[in-house]
């Protein structure tokens, strides 16, 4: 089985409960699942030097080849809520395109989507509808001020 992840954040970013995702990914790899991740270049909780380093890393492989991570360019996360909303929207647009048309994504059997930012679920539902693959929506860390 091959699992597609369309994530707003991915290591080395500082996001809520990073060990939960890392443990899940390790368990999936240990169970023999292949994973494909599309995520923006890191921005949250890292130095500018690390961000610059990752601008050159468009593809990484983890878990002895079981996980392929593809990163795409996107503006850095800011404190301004309008810019943050713009960033999330642009990320979802890019992930919809990647999840629908990218070669590695087209080989996936199922999608696993986190619930933050809240518009991730809507984007994933569109990918599911177009691709006709199952979707696991991991609902957590939703607070009223997020909506």
Give the ranges of each region predicted by the language model.
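An aromatic- and histidine-rich active-site surface loop
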Residues: 85-100, 110-131, 137-140, 144
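N-terminal subdomain of nucleotide-sugar transferases
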Residues: 1-63
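Short glycine-/acidic-enriched loop or helix-start segments at secondary-structure transitions
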Residues: 15-16, 47-48, 81, 122-124, ...
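Short glycine/proline- and charge-enriched loop/turn segments
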Residues: 53, 146-147
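A conserved catalytic-core segment of Leloir-type glycosyltransferases
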Residues: 37-102
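Active-site loop signature of alpha/beta-hydrolase-fold enzymes
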Residues: 12, 43, 77, 144-145
